[in-house]
Structure formats: C-alpha cells, structure tokens
Amino acid sequence: MALSTFLFDLDGTLIDSIELILRSYRHTMRAHRGLEPPDEVWMKGLGTPLSVQFRHWTDDPAEIEAMVATYRAYNLEHHDALVRPYDGVVVAVRALRHQGKTLGLVTSKMRSGALRGLQVAGLDDAFDVIVGSDEVTNPKPHPEPVLKALERLGAPATGAVFIGDSRHDIECGQAAGVKTAAVLWGPFDRAHLADLEPDYWLERPEDLAALG
C-alpha cells in the first residue's frame, strides 16, 4: 500500500537543535547540581519529555519542575540563534505536501515549543496536525502520540509512516503499527538504531521522495 500519511519527529529530524538542547542541559545541571555530566547521559533520553529525562537526577517532583523551568528559560532565550532546519528538509517536506500527502508532527516538545521551532524553520504552515507532549498522557516511546495524530487526521495506520532520528521514535511508531523511517542526518548513526530494524533508512532529506 502506498504511503499517504507522513508523521515527523521534530528535533534531530526536521530541525538541528542539538547544540541548543545540550547547552540548555549543561546550564540546568550547573545551576541545580553544580556539575556538568557527560552529554551522552542526556543524549540517551533524547526524544522523551524533559520531566522524564530529569528523573535521572531526582525523584522530587518540585525539583524536577524547577529544573524543567530553568531548562526552558535558557532554551527560549537562545532558541532562535541556535536552531535551523537541516539542509534539504524544507524542500523535501514541501514536496510531499505538494504531492497531496497528509503531514503530521509528533514531538516530545510542548506544542508551544514545537511551533516556535517550526516558525524558525519556515515550516509552521506545513502540517495538518501537531501533537505535543502536553497533549498526551503517555509520551514516546509509548504509541499514544502517533495514535493521537492518526485519530485527529482520521487516517489509518496502514499507509502511514513515522519518521524520526531516535530509538524512541522508532519504538513509538512500531508500537502504533505504522511504518518507520530512521533518518541518518541527525545525531544518531545507523549502528545506534540497527537492532530496531526500521522499515526505511533515510540518508538525506531527498530520500523522502522515494517513500511517496
């Protein structure tokens, strides 16, 4: 069956925000813990909500809330200067839309943060639906975000593909019963995702055209 519904992750897939994410993490850890852990610790949780990632450091809900607030304040201040779309992404996404494909965004960011990223990338009008972490009970890798996007679109899982860069994206898509496509222009390489056996590997944004 031809693919008609294309669901995208945001960070590491459409926009290169990795440096901003890591700077925000380092700033938060210095402010709340007086230390700067290796970036690899944070990268393991990339693609999950902030509240989930900060549980690595504390179980105190009040402290987690404070850490999230510190992170978001720094992230917002530096967002527009450090975020850009990956080369070729805007053209590839708009080509799919021109072909009549249904497009959705499924992100672990809050909806407001996702909209900010799309605006910087020039893609704020490209998607038929956006599902943020503040709109679901169970974030990625749980299937709920993808299932909610499909529900809002009135689209079946057959004919749908979820495109992302992280293990959480691939696991989410597989659990939701859609095809999965792993992008290799983001922070993770093929070896990091190979055991999950995504349906498609995308070396560059131009490869999206072959899925349509």
Task: Name each model-derived stretch.
Residues 1-4, 97, 111, 115-212:
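Asp-based, Mg2+/Mn2+-dependent phosphohydrolase catalytic module
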Residues 2-94, 99:
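N-terminal helical cap/lid subdomain that shapes the substrate entry/recognition surface
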Residues 13, 107-109:
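Conserved phosphate-coupling serine/threonine residues in phosphotransfer and NTP-handling enzymes
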